[in-house]
Amino acid sequence: MKQSFSRPHFENQELDSLKIGEKIFNSRLMVGTGKYNNLKEAIKSIDYSGANIVTVAIRRAQNSKNLGRSNLLDGLDWSKLWILPNTAGCESAEEAVRIAALGREIVKKLGQTDNNFIKLEVIPDSHYLFPDPIGTLKAAEYLVKKGFIVMPYIGADPVLAKQLENIGCATVMPLASPIGSGQGLKNLLNLKIIIENSNIPVIIDAGIGTPSEAAKVMEMGASGVLVNTAIARAPNSPQMAKAMSLAVKSGRLTHTAGRMIINQTANPSSPIFGISK
């Protein structure tokens, strides 16, 4: 049975919903939980974003818990948000599989007993943080067989994106530019190819620095956007979260409305006939 997941206070926009697995979400903006100055700022920003899906690094959350520190797993109301555990910090497929299993247990303890989502990250490169395509494919294939709803973070590689779709991944999440860099849309052609060739949702993840960039990929036909650093590192994080929310909605509406045809000549909007001179 399909389940709908939305915030009670979500504005009733004329937006089609986003389906991932058997879950339906009203917001196409997903947000992260890292790099905020404090928990209060993070919670306020997540609220302002209007996001349904919030991703949490399982390794970081577990370390905070072991040290007795407060973290967003305790601070957020998970009856109103859908947690997307991620395998950030994993350098191999085997490590990612172990962390994914831990993540599934954690979300069940938070009350989301039907949550099998995992944002798969396999990143052996500590400098540029580019994901390992071979390790990602290997881990994804195993996790899909184990019943996970796999959402892999990948480079902007159309061939890999299609392979991940073919083995049963629920989405693909190609980067726009290096994670946390704010460099913006450096792979537009490849992103466009991935979007055009995909039969599953394409969520643009990493590198987006401004709302205009989020709107641009949504106009291209992306299914959604995941933003963390651009919000968390903004001087006014809650305000930037709201701006990203509006940009994603605007971009999606633009895509579904359709762009006007570009003309090579001018075309006046006011009539030039029938007016006395």
UniProtKB/Swiss-Prot annotation:
It is an enzyme of class 2 (transferase). InterPro entries: Aldolase_TIM (IPR013785), Thiazole_synthase_ThiG (IPR033983), ThiG (IPR008867). The active site is at K119. 1-deoxy-D-xylulose 5-phosphate binds at G180, A206, G207, N228, T229. GO terms for molecular function: thiazole synthase activity. One of its GO terms (biological process) is thiamine diphosphate biosynthetic process. CDD domains: ThiG. Catalyzes the rearrangement of 1-deoxy-D-xylulose 5-phosphate (DXP) to produce the thiazole phosphate moiety of thiamine. Sulfur is provided by the thiocarboxylate moiety of the carrier protein ThiS. In vitro, sulfur can be provided by H(2)S. Belongs to the ThiG family. This is Thiazole synthase. It comes from Pyropia yezoensis (Susabi-nori). The lineage of its organism: Eukaryota, Rhodophyta, Bangiophyceae, Bangiales, Bangiaceae. The gene is thiG.
